């Protein structure tokens, strides 16, 4: 299926590009999320009319993400979780827990933006985590997992 990208999509293309993707990817993800539109003749003409407006919105979104990234980069957050004597957690700290802790600290982060390269955190200590605020803005955050023993 031919689609027009309405925003930058990682590993696919930039705003305004007409790309060919699998039908399911377009119908089930890109079009419902507002990232793309079917590339019909009328849609292409409408897009060209709105192109400047969409580029301004994309630039504003990027600037907001960069400003948030400057504040967030290098921050350390602390999460308390039940742990055994050996420093292993009962359960784990997931991207949902980290996003929630960042939200309490005043940052707008959703769990899909938190990247855990080695999977959920299962030990007490300090762990580096990356947060992708935008496709072009990726920051590093330190998560300190504190074990509580009862």
UniProtKB/Swiss-Prot annotation:
MF terms (GO), sorted A to Z: rRNA binding; structural constituent of ribosome
Stored Gene3D superfamilies: Ribosomal protein L9, C-terminal domain, Ribosomal protein L9, N-terminal domain
Keyword RNA-binding part of the UniProt annotation: yes
Pfam families listed in its UniProt record: Ribosomal_L9_C, Ribosomal_L9_N
Entry-linked InterPro entries: Ribosomal_bL9 (IPR000244), Ribosomal_bL9/RNase_H1_N (IPR009027), Ribosomal_bL9_bac/chp (IPR020594), Ribosomal_bL9_C (IPR020069), Ribosomal_bL9_C_sf (IPR036791), Ribosomal_bL9_N (IPR020070), Ribosomal_bL9_N_sf (IPR036935)
Superkingdom assignment: Bacteria
GO biological process: translation
Keyword tRNA processing in annotation: no
Any one annotated GO CC term: ribonucleoprotein complex
Keywords: Ribonucleoprotein, Ribosomal protein, RNA-binding, rRNA-binding
Family: Belongs to the bacterial ribosomal protein bL9 family.
Role summary: Binds to the 23S rRNA.
Name this polypeptide is given: Large ribosomal subunit protein bL9
Source organism per UniProt: Methylibium petroleiphilum (strain ATCC BAA-1232 / LMG 22953 / PM1)
Taxonomic lineage: Bacteria, Pseudomonadati, Pseudomonadota, Betaproteobacteria, Burkholderiales
């Amino acid at each position: 299926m031919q689609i027009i990208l309405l925003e930058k999509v990682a590993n696919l293309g930039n705003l305004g590009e007409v790309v060919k993707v699998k039908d399911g990817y377009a119908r089930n993800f890109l079009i419902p999320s507002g990232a793309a539109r079917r590339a019909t003749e009328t849609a292409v003409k409408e897009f060209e009319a709105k192109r400047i407006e969409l580029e301004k919105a994309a630039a504003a979104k990027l600037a907001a993400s960069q400003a948030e990234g400057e504040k967030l980069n290098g921050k350390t957050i602390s999460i308390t979780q039940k742990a055994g004597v050996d420093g292993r957690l009962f359960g784990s700290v997931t991207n949902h827990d980290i996003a929630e802790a960042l939200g309490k600290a005043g940052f707008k982060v959703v769990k899909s933006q938190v990247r855990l390269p080695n999977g959920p955190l299962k030990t007490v200590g300090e762990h580096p985590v990356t947060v992708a605020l935008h496709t072009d803005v990726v920051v590093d955050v330190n998560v300190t997992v504190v074990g509580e023993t009862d």
